[in-house]
From Swiss-Prot:
This is Chromosomal replication initiator protein DnaA. The keyword Thylakoid does not apply. Residues 75-106 are annotated as: Domain II. ATP binds at residues 151, 153-155. Gene3D superfamilies: 1.10.1750.10, 1.10.8.60, 3.30.300.180, P-loop containing nucleotide triphosphate hydrolases (3.40.50.300). SUPFAM superfamilies: P-loop containing nucleoside triphosphate hydrolases (SSF52540), TrpR-like (SSF48295). GO terms for molecular function: ATP binding; ATP hydrolysis activity; DNA replication origin binding; lipid binding. The lineage of its organism: Bacteria, Pseudomonadati, Campylobacterota, Epsilonproteobacteria, Campylobacterales. It comes from the Bacteria. Belongs to the DnaA family. Residues 1-75 are annotated as: Domain I, interacts with DnaA modulators. Residues 322-455 are annotated as: Domain IV, binds dsDNA. It comes from Helicobacter pylori (strain Shi470).
């Protein structure tokens, strides 16, 4: 082994003793010593990308300086050593694979664009991040992870990024984690992993839907880990979609959770009434269906689960009107949509309510069951009380015991507090939270119903 490699190994060994295993494995282990630029009073290092370069300089620059000032590690260094970290020069890839990215099986859907994405207060941040990512020649944030409940437009925004990138003649791969797994297993069985790696690692935009389903599959996680690292090191844009934040993806390897949070994460909130009405109008236009204004308003007000349900309601009204040879009016809409208006959250268990609130606020259920002064935990406990009073027959005493409350009168105060935020203050955050929690409750209860019906 040459002297420079020995020096680098010595430096990394000293760093490893001073930082946590996760920080070392995910970040600091990627430092490369640059002997050509280093001098007696300055030690130069390479980091694989600007994000790591800035992060290590800000968080561990002083530590590196201290280590090198106190340990000579084979270098002729002065007593006081400065440390510089730069982005490593890109390695030219000699032979690019000849892949038709637009012909990949899991390709981008042409119908999902930025132009037909309805923007509201619930998703404006996500929309702006997505547009910036799609329009930039180099990744402004990497990776990007959007998360939120089902049917809120996450897949639409992912495809919109892909479509815009394709217009700029970029190489785009858009795939669900399920299809990524299927493709991985196929190439593994056929012993053609080189082809698999070329397909997914030599693109400009790697867009992954349903990232949460990577968890619990060690071989797939290992392959994705290396795919992610190579794409990131080569400044290729990575965008991930998930139904929950990285820290709440149970069973996902810590090193992947860490990488998912390297760039920027943004939550897609349920649409408010104004946005829902805009979505209903747009879906009518896309499906070439004409509905009276009052019917569109009725759908926006009463079909609150998700965007797909709103579109389903529009089509259901139109189909029934044609079959019955009847004009579309409010009475017809009410009759046709009666089953969709039923609140599936009725009869929820306290455990499901606790889980739905925890998922919506990115908390653990165990955190909510213990009294805390943290604002998000206090709000979560109030929301559990609010939904329990709405949807369960549990008496105040059992609810107080469930949340470990000594004073049973606190239940009424907590319920009234949420009601005030919703009805008097009309807090946009709490209003959107209510919709998201209801959506999650519906999903949890529907799963329970499906399970019992299959027994």
């Amino acid at each position: 082994m040459d002297t420079n490699n020995n020096i680098e190994k010595e430096i990394l060994a000293l760093i490893k003793q001073k930082v946590s295993p996760i920080e070392y494995e995910n970040c600091l282990s990627q430092l490369k010593y640059n002997p050509n630029a280093s001098k007696s009073d300055i030690a130069f290092f390479y980091a694989p990308n600007m994000l790591l370069c800035n992060w290590i300089t800000a968080k561990h620059g002083a530590l590196l300086k201290e280590i090198l000032s106190q340990n000579k590690v084979g270098m002729h260094l002065a007593h006081s050593v400065d440390v510089r970290i730069e982005v490593a020069p890109k390695i030219q890839i000699s032979a690019q694979p000849n892949i038709n990215y637009k012909a990949v099986k899991t390709s981008v859907k042409d119908s999902y664009t930025f132009e037909n994405f309805v923007v509201g207060s619930c998703n404006n941040t996500v929309y702006e991040i997505a547009k910036k990512v799609a329009q930039s020649d180099t990744p402004p944030y990497n990776p990007v992870l959007f998360y939120g409940g089902t049917g809120l437009g996450k897949t639409h925004i992912l495809n919109a990024i892909g479509n815009h990138a394709l217009e700029k003649h970029k190489k785009v791969v858009l795939v669900t984690s399920e299809d990524f797994l299927t493709d991985f297993l196929k190439h593994l069985d056929n012993q053609t992993m080189d082809s698999f790696k070329k397909k997914y690692r030599h693109c400009d935009f790697f867009l992954l839907d349903d990232a949460q389903f990577l968890q619990g599959k060690p071989k797939l996680e290992e392959e994705f880990f290396h795919t992610f690292n190579e794409l990131h090191a080569n400044s290729k844009q990575i965008v991930l979609i998930s139904d929950r934040s990285p820290k709440n993806i149970a069973g996902l390897e810590d090193r992947l959770k860490s990488r998912f949070e390297w760039g920027i994460t943004a939550k897609v909130m349920p649409p408010d009434l104004e946005t829902k009405l805009s979505i209903v109008k747009q879906k009518c236009q896309l499906n070439k269906i004409t509905l009276p204004e009052e019917v569109m308003e009725y759908i926006a007000q009463h079909i609150s689960d998700n965007i797909r349900q709103m579109e389903g309601a529009i089509i259901k009204i139109s189909v029934n009107a044609n079959l019955m040879n009847a004009p579309i009016d409010l009475n017809l809409a009410k009759t046709v949509l009666e089953d969709l208006q039923k609140d599936h959250a009725e009869g929820s268990s306290l455990e499901n309510i606790l889980l739905a609130v925890a998922q919506s606020l990115n908390l653990k259920s165990s955190e909510i069951k213990i009294s805390s002064r943290q604002k998000n935990v206090a709000l979560a406990r109030k929301l559990v009380v609010y939904f329990a009073r709405l949807y369960t027959p549990n008496p105040t005493l059992s609810l107080a015991q469930f949340l470990d409350l000594k004073d049973h009168s606190s239940i009424s105060k907590m319920y009234s507090s949420v009601k005030k935020m919703l009805e008097e203050e009309k807090s946009p955050f709490v209003l959107s939270l209510r919709e998201e929690i209801k959506n999650r409750l519906n999903e949890l209860n529907d799963k329970k119903t499906a399970f019992h019906s299959s027994e």
